[in-house]
């Protein structure tokens, strides 16, 4: 089979395709993984695939941005790869790879894969672009969906949103949640917390709010800072730790100074190993304008850290209101601050929410469950086409 992703940048899709490609080996699938190049300033997560022994074919012409120069070349390169591999299944991940990969399948002639699958790891059809661009993208997705055997959404909210805006009927979708090796990505060790607190000079009894991500407009980092300022005004002794880089980092650090909170803020930049930071945090804040399935929320809950987030995209499928975190509307600065204050003032509530979160996400987001679900779907689609099945494990 041929799997295509726009790029292996930091985030859930890169983890997903790496773990999935490796896991399906034991089920009799041979995967060729094609990945495009990172955008300027993005951090790579290709090391996950490398550590798993997954071979990646680099397609430098495949960029996240629309390019009248490079996009036709990327399509032609994928057509060539389809003709070389002759896959039974083409599976694309993320918007750009979905467009380029499925276009290539249409142009591959007699080598065209009989089964075409696309996974939406969220979508860019709300909150990312101006109305005209968004409408063009919607029409493109609708056209591509008519040539796709099955569409996958990483959560029911993502599926429902895509159905609502008319991308495809509900029966064309399957919901298959992410699978993550949480044991490898999250440390639940009190000694790590102590080490991190000593490293950054944070007293053990101080409430630490954490944020992890790429600093772009969709993540609404200004809301993180504004809600943290409000939290301090509520009388909470707190530190904010920002983990991540991106085009908005300088603006965020400037805003922290303008708000008068810079001495309470740790901005540590991109970190390849994030598990020690979950140990440092008491809670995670995630005020994004849009999310697919937020890996940072899953990892925080696995580390027994409650999450305060916005009620967007696939977030409600990860964070259960009042049980392992709190959900607010986008832009609700007071709501974010009040939820964080509630957690800061009640260590027992934090403990209960953290335990509930870990108990829920560990089984739900296992890699083995992901591989089982995708294997079952592939076998169903191959059977419908009358194609041979891989040997059962």
PLM segments and residue spans:
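N-terminal strand-loop element at the rim of the active site
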Residues: 3-11, 15-70, 247
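A conserved mid-protein helix/loop that constitutes part of the nucleotide-sugar donor-binding site
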Residues: 14-22, 207, 211-236, 247-254, ...
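Nucleotide-sugar donor phosphate/pyrophosphate-binding loop at the beta->alpha transition
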Residues: 69-76, 111-117, 124-147, 160, ...
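A short, active-site helix/loop in glycosyltransferases that binds the activated sugar's phosphate group
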Residues: 146-173, 180-184
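A short, well-ordered alpha-helix in the C-terminal region of glycosyltransferases
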Residues: 195, 335, 342, 349-364, ...
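Aromatic "clamp/platform" in nucleotide-sugar-dependent glycosyltransferases that forms part
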Residues: 270, 289
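Short hydrophobic beta-strand element within catalytic cores of glycosyltransferases
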Residues: 306-309, 319
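Conserved acidic donor-binding segment of nucleotide-sugar-dependent glycosyltransferases
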Residues: 321-322, 326-333, 342-347
């Amino acid at each position: 089979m041929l799997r295509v992703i726009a790029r292996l940048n930091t985030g859930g899709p890169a983890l997903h395709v790496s773990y999935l490609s490796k896991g399906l080996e034991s089920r009799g699938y041979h995967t060729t993984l094609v990945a495009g190049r990172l955008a300027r300033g993005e951090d790579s997560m290709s090391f996950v695939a490398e550590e798993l022994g997954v071979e990646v074919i680099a397609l430098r012409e495949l960029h996240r941005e629309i390019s009248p120069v490079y996009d036709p070349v990327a399509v032609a390169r994928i057509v060539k790869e389809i003709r070389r591999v002759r896959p039974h299944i083409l599976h694309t991940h993320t918007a750009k790879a979905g467009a380029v990969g499925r276009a290539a399948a249409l142009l591959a002639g007699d080598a065209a894969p009989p089964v075409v699958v696309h996974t939406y790891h969220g979508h860019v059809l709300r909150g990312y672009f101006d109305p005209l661009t968004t409408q063009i993208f919607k029409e493109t997705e609708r056209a591509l969906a008519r040539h796709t055997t099955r569409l996958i959404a990483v959560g029911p909210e993502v599926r429902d949103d895509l159905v609502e805006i008319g991308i495809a009927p509900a029966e064309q979708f399957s919901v298959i949640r992410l699978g993550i090796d949480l044991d490898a990505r999250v440390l639940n060790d009190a000694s790590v917390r102590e080490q991190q607190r000593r490293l950054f000079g944070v007293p053990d009894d101080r409430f630490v709010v954490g944020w992890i991500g790429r600093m772009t407009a969709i993540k609404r980092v200004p809301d993180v800072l504004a809600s943290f300022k409000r939290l301090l005004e509520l009388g909470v002794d707190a530190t904010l730790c920002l983990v991540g880089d991106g085009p908005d980092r300088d603006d965020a650090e400037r805003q922290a100074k303008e708000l008068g909170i810079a001495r309470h803020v740790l901005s540590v930049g991109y970190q390849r190993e994030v598990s020690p930071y979950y140990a440092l945090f008491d809670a995670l804040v995630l005020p994004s304008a849009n999310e697919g399935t937020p890996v940072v929320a899953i990892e925080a809950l696995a580390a027994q850290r409650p999450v305060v987030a916005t009620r967007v995209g696939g977030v409600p499928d990860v964070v259960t209101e009042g049980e392992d975190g709190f959900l607010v509307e986008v832009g609700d600065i007071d709501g974010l601050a009040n939820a964080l204050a509630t957690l800061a003032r009640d260590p027992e509530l934090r403990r209960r929410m953290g335990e509930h979160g870990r108990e829920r996400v560990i089984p739900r987001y296992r890699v083995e469950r992901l591989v089982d679900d995708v294997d079952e779907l592939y076998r169903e689609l191959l059977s419908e086409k009358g194609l041979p099945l891989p040997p059962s494990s």
